[in-house]
Structures are given as structure tokens and as C-alpha cells.
Amino acid sequence: MTRSFRLLEASGTFERRDILSSQIDRPRSFLNVEFAQKPDVTALQSWVSVVIGKNGVGKSRLLAGIADIFETLGRGRKRDDELGVSRLAYASDDRLCEIETDSIFRLRGKVDGRRCELTELPLPTKVIALTTTPFDKFRISRSLLGFPRQQHPDLPERYTYLGLRDRFGRASPTAVIFRAIEGLFNASRAEASRRLRIAEVFGFLGYKPHIQVRYEFNTPSMERLKRIVAGDLLKRVEAPGTNSGLWRLEKMLEQDPSLLSQVRSIAEDALHRANGTRFFSLRADFEGYSEDDRFFQKVQLLRRAGLLGMRAAEVERVIDGAVLDLKLASSGELGIVTGFLGLASVIEDGSLIFIDEPEISLHPEWQTRYIDLLLKTFGNFGGCHFALATHSPLILSDIAPENSNVVSLDPNRREAEDAEAFAGRSADYLLVAAFQVPGKNNLYIKQEIIKALRLAANGKAATNEFANILESLVVLLPQMEEDSPVAELIRELQEAAEASMAIQ
């Protein structure tokens, strides 16, 4: 198993070729991006790369394209004509690995410069896509789509999608809640060491190490289930001439008639748990012990058939015992809690985690702490690489120089940049230095203009210090309104510099 993973480089168009798009003659943007330098030794400390760039430059496509490569390899496939990736380079433990695609979309592998079979390539332990935007570009996990595992069906899926879209592609907050819950129930039967790690994530978020899901039958569904359990035929369960409330179940049985016996067995157990009421609860516990995980998987058959609904998904605060229903949480709380708990349920040492636009719905205070919270929450998982695509200067300012870097998709950059220049800096500075967005009332620009004016007033317009400040200001002029006072001041400083040079 991989103990340490570091993504180094990625090249390609990072767009999928479906049948329609392949018939349309349109330019495809090619990116060659450096994510990080190869560590000198096996890096057991996790790493963060913050990916920045303007809308439309390909941040989301970049992350999704890389995830697609590893998802394809994780399925044991050797080619995929939907991939726009031409090359990936990464470090797995102490080995340098490369993946390339040829002209007919076959994948080729190298380890330490030598050709190898794709099955010999060490891959990240897990590849996880976490997002709270309904417009993400990530591929939905095959398990969510209901596809069977082609090879090694007994092994857990390498790629996991933790986003808003359900298996039909529809965006729904309920989908992301259920996905986190499903992962937690699966993990609740893991070995003790893994359950302890997940319990620590709950604790760091301020919650007790368990989650409780409350299910509810509506009255018609409950009566239908009682009759199904009693052995009635489906056509006799509904009164003649009424709209069938069993249409979902009927469609499922058209595909697999044997499901009816499973529905009867599961419904009997669920009704027994409800004990004459319309409600029952299941619990995933990472400190104590619960056997509810297996029934949780079974009861999803009733949920998909429309015979059962999830009423609440509850976590309990440590400080006061207050219960938070995730279905009623704010969008910011939902993003943090379900995102981090969902991630906790699948992350392992040596994972590659993509996070797209984490700032969505987050209060500025949470944005300023996001990366720190991420690393502390998952500090007991080593050798992971987190790649975040963001437009937020507040998130960027939270990076730690010792284990982070910045990746800009600006055409003139696209190299891994030292985090030292961005860590802890003001939002106004980062809007200029990182995002090249001066705005109309940027305090940092005003301070730089004041410095330049003082130098000019002191007869130092010909100095290197003045020239450096002026150069950093002039490059911002194309992004400013022509008649803005700030732009006029910068042009006047240019004229002062030219006059000073003429005198010399």
C-alpha cells in the first residue's frame, strides 16, 4: 500500500471527449502544469497545492481530468478515449512514476524512467473528489451509478465522488448528506485503528463520535409494506383505480423480479424496528459498537423504492449535547461537516484528494481557517496530497509555507510557486499578487503608490526600488478602468520615471 503520494506534473486538454463534443470543431486548451517538486525522501507529511486562475482557464477540468486517469486505471482499463490527459508525473513513496497516453488513447506507464505494465504502477491509495458546487466536472463514482466492479469486486473502490450530484446527475444537498452517511456506516465496521482515526475527526469538529439516521414511513407506505410482508401480490396492494404508490418498486422488479423477496424480508425487519410507530433509527458508532451498518445497506432498497424516507441525520455536540440535524444545517455547516465526515470515511494514508471551490457558502472566518482546519482534522493521515481549486484570497492566505505551494494557471506561470510569498498576506495583496485583480479600492495598491510617490518626491525615481514598485503597478493597468484615479496616478508615476531617465 502507498504510504506517501505527491502529484508532480500534469499535461493535457483536461476535457472529456463524448460523442457530441468530438464532432464539434472547437479549440481545446492545452495545459502543462507543475504541481510540486519531487520530495528528496518519502514524504509522510501531507501536502497542499492551491490551484488558482481566472474563470474558464480549466481549474475544474484539470482536477477532474487527473481524477479520470486514476479512476480509469483503478478499474483495470488500459485505454480510454474520453481522457484529454497526455501525461502525469507523481511520486509514490520513493518512486518517480509517469503515465502517458498515445495517439490512440492507450495508457503507458513508467517507474523510475523504465517502462512497466500498468498493473505495476503504484497508485494513490484513494482518489477522492470533494466539492459543494453543482457545476463540478468530476466523474460520479461507478458504485453510485450502479455499475458492477469488473475486476476484483471484493476490493474497495479506489475513486470516490463526494459532491452534490446524484446518480442521475441532479444536484441535491440530500445527496451529499447521504453520501457522507453511507461512507460512515461502511467505515463503522472497519478495524479498530481506522475507527479511532474517524472518531478523532468527529472530535476535532466538536462532535461525539457517532451519527444517527432517523427513518420514517408515511402512512400509505407503511400499510403497503404490511401487505407486502403478509404476502399479498403487488396488484392487490393498491386499491383499483388509484394511482400506484409502488411504481418505483414495480420498475425495479421489471429489471430483477427476485428483489421482491428481499423487499419482504427487509420490510419485515424495518417494521419490527419501528415497533408500531412510523419511525426507526440506525447508528454508526466509532467509539462504542453497533451492528446497524449491515441493515443500513439493506434498507436502502426500501428507500430507492420510495417506501421509506430519511427524516433526519443527527450529530451531537460534545460541549453541550446539542443535536444538529444535517438536513437542517446551513449551507456552510453542511459543506464543512458533511465534506469532512465524508472524507474521513474514505481517506487513507497516501491518498490524492481534489477539493473544488471549497469557499462556496463559507463565512469569511471559515475561509481564513479552512486549510488549517483541513490539515489538523486529517493530521493523523500521512502522505496525502490535497489539491484545492479556489477563487478565494482568504483560503489562499491560510496556506502553511512548510507543506504547501501555489499553482497558477496563468499562461506565464504554471509552475509550483513557494507558499512563502502568499501565506498570511492580506486579501488586498493576494488579489493583486496572486489573482491579478486590482479592483477599484485596493488598499495594497494605494500603499504601493504612496511608497512610489515618496521615493519620487525624495529624488529617487531612478532607483531600483522605485522601478520595482512601478513595474508591479504598471502590469495591473490593463485590468483597471481607463479613467480611474488609481490608473491616472500610476501613469503619472510612469511619466516621472521617464523624465528622471531623460535627465540622466
State where each predicted segment sits.
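A structural signal for short, well-ordered beta-strand segments and their strand-loop junctions
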Residues: 128-131, 211-216, 354, 388, ...
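Switch/communication elements of ASCE P-loop NTPase nucleotide-binding domains
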Residues: 1-76, 309-444
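A short hydrophobic beta-strand->loop->alpha-helix junction that borders the nucleotide-binding pocket
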Residues: 131-134, 163
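Acidic, Mg2+-coordinating catalytic modules of nucleic-acid enzymes
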Residues: 2-17, 40-45, 136-139, 145-158, ...
